[in-house]
């Protein structure tokens, strides 16, 4: 499988390049990042534009760019019949609706979008979804490095959405006076509060807190190194050609 990486100069993108180059079933043929054009990523010279994918005859593009760039790159990939695996944060429901249109599953290119490629994080979201019907209150706290531009994270939003879909019985926030604006975080799906922390020294962490009378449950996942995302990325790259249309999340790949 011939693979190109978009956002190849970033922390995640450079790690993905190394993972693609190291896998015996994959071939890194293109690396794209306008901010690092001319540099080297896992033995490949970084190009400045997405057209490098066509020149290298890439079959799959892995997207780890800012959301603004990802939108245009995904349109290009759909038009040029390149499968896409997307780890970009900041894509909303409107973006997913457009991706369903761009990748309709009619024999053309396919697309997998995952809010998180760490297997532990996927399990955390699944466990939170399973626990949701048994609790009346819940909050999500996500913590990331201080270079992350978007807040809250896509993982936090997806977690709240899955919990809200699993249970509609969430108690209303009792806070009537917020002394410091934003102290109670933002409201995710179902009114579930989502809090974002940006701190130097972190990679990524998320904790889901659920409570009911007399008990609480905490579900937490910590990322200590970006290599933990690579098995999920590799899994998605190898699977995307056989997953018609748009697939959201790794659950379908892991659990069927």
Predicted regions and their residues:
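Hydrophobic beta-strand scaffold residues
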Residues: 28, 46, 84-85, 110-113
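Extreme N-terminal starter segment of soluble prokaryotic enzymes
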Residues: 1-3
